[in-house]
Curated annotation (Swiss-Prot):
Function summary: Snake venom phospholipase A2 (PLA2) that induces myonecrosis, when intramuscularly injected into mice. Does not show systemic myotoxic effect (after intravenous injection). Does not show cytotoxic activities in myotubes and myoblasts. Induces marked paw edema after subplantar injections. Also induces an increase in vascular permeability and in the levels of TNF-alpha, IL-6, and IL-1 cytokines.
Active site: H30, D65
Gene Ontology cellular component list: extracellular region
Protein name per UniProt: Basic phospholipase A2 Bbil-TX
EC number: 3.1.1.4
Length: 98
């Protein structure tokens, strides 16, 4: 949910270069946090994301999304549309493990 504050995450980042999707850099920590979407309370004030009170699991998932959203925001200036739907076969090196 929080990724929407940077760009619509699915079309812009799901298959972006070697940096998002399974095995990507900004998305790596996010991928390790969980493998499904969930709903949780959060707010956006002055460009800062704040996770609200919820169950322990909701708060942890929100924090995973917050960190990923901030990572993507820091990378916006280097976003290149040519890397959308980039083939995995062009990525070099082993993927990290969680």
């Amino acid at each position: 949910h929080l990724l929407q504050f940077n760009k619509n995450a699915i079309p812009f980042y799901a298959f972006y270069g070697c940096y998002c999707g399974w095995g990507g850099r900004c998305c790596f920590v996010h991928d390790c946090c969980y493998g499904k979407w969930d709903i949780y309370p959060y707010s956006l004030k002055s460009g800062y994301i704040t996770c609200g009170k919820g169950t322990w699991c909701e708060e942890q998932i929100c924090e995973c999304d917050r960190v990923a959203a901030e990572c993507l925001r820091r990378s916006l200036s280097t976003y290149k549309y040519g890397y959308m739907f980039y083939p995995d076969s062009r990525c070099r090196g082993p993927s990290e493990t969680c």
